[in-house]
Amino acid sequence: MIASGRHQWTNDYPAEHDIKDDINNGNAYVLTVDGEVAVYGAVALNGEPQYDFIDGDWLTTGDYYVIHRFATLPSFQREGLARIFISKVNSMCEVEKIPSIKVDTNFDNTPMINLLSSMGFCICGRVNYGGNRGQRFAFEKLSIAMEPAE
């Protein structure tokens, strides 16, 4: 991420302890290809306190899954695997009746912005992490279709 000139992450984030915390909390998910990890993401239920302070408006106010520390290994990029990972998170939402997925990304992370936009995520505003992490675009996607009342 840093090598590509994007400011999504810093030299100290994410750190090894962040990934270990994801694993210990049951939030670490991987997509594998032939037994090799291709995509990693931390997926947590209602797992981002900063989202309570959005400069904007979320589509929903209920439960959500958040995806953090989302990365595709370079040797697997441009194969559609990030899209598959997010689709699987959407399936988790449908099974568990969680109405949406929320994600934030840095303003210069064009590949992620394009991926989210192409998958039906809406930009809802900005969240501010302060310090080196600063502001991020905040995205949300509804995962369960609304049905008319009868």
What positions do the PLM features span?
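Conserved catalytic-core motifs of GNAT/GCN5-like acyltransferases
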Residues: 104-105, 117-137
